[in-house]
Amino acid sequence: MAKKVQAYVKLQVAAGMANPSPPVGPALGQQGVNIMEFCKAFNAKTESIEKGLPIPVVITVYSDRSFTFVTKTPPAAVLLKKAAGIKSGSGKPNKDKVGTVTSAQVREIAETKAADMTGASIDDMMRSIEGTARSMGLVVEG
C-alpha cells in the first residue's frame, strides 16, 4: 500500500547549512518529522553546491512521519545578485540602477534554472530572467 501524504512543506534553506533552528526546526517539528535526519540528508545532498546559497526545498511528509524531499535551483534573484556582484537590488529600480549583467550571464543563469522551469525554451527563460534583473535595478547588456 502506498504511503499517505500528510503535508508538503516548502522552505528555503542555505546549502550545506541546514540545522534544527528556525525555519527548519519549527516547520518540520510541527509535522512530527525527525529534524536531524532531514538536516543530515539535506546537507549531504547540497554539499556540492556553494555553501550558504539559498536552496528551495519541497519536503513531502507522510502519515508514518517519514519524508522525502526535492531540492530546486537557487532563486533567479540570488543568482543575478551574485553575477552582478551586488548585495541587494534597487529600492527604485526604474530610477536607480545598481549594477549590470551581460546577456551571457543571463543565458548561464537560464541554463542553470532550466531544470526547474519545465516547458520553456532557453530564450523564454532568458526573457523571464531579464525581467527579474530589470525589476531589481540591473541593466542587461548585449
From Swiss-Prot:
One or more lysine residues are methylated. GO terms for biological process: translation. One of its GO terms (cellular component) is cytosolic large ribosomal subunit. The keyword RNA-binding applies. Gene3D superfamilies: Ribosomal protein L11, C-terminal domain, Ribosomal protein L11/L12, N-terminal domain. The keyword Iron does not apply. Keywords: Methylation, Ribonucleoprotein, Ribosomal protein, RNA-binding, rRNA-binding. Part of the ribosomal stalk of the 50S ribosomal subunit. Interacts with L10 and the large rRNA to form the base of the stalk. L10 forms an elongated spine to which L12 dimers bind in a sequential fashion forming a multimeric L10(L12)X complex. Belongs to the universal ribosomal protein uL11 family. HAMAP family: Ribosomal_uL11 (MF_00736). Forms part of the ribosomal stalk which helps the ribosome interact with GTP-bound translation factors. This is Large ribosomal subunit protein uL11. It comes from Yersinia enterocolitica serotype O:8 / biotype 1B (strain NCTC 13174 / 8081). The lineage of its organism: Bacteria, Pseudomonadati, Pseudomonadota, Gammaproteobacteria, Enterobacterales.
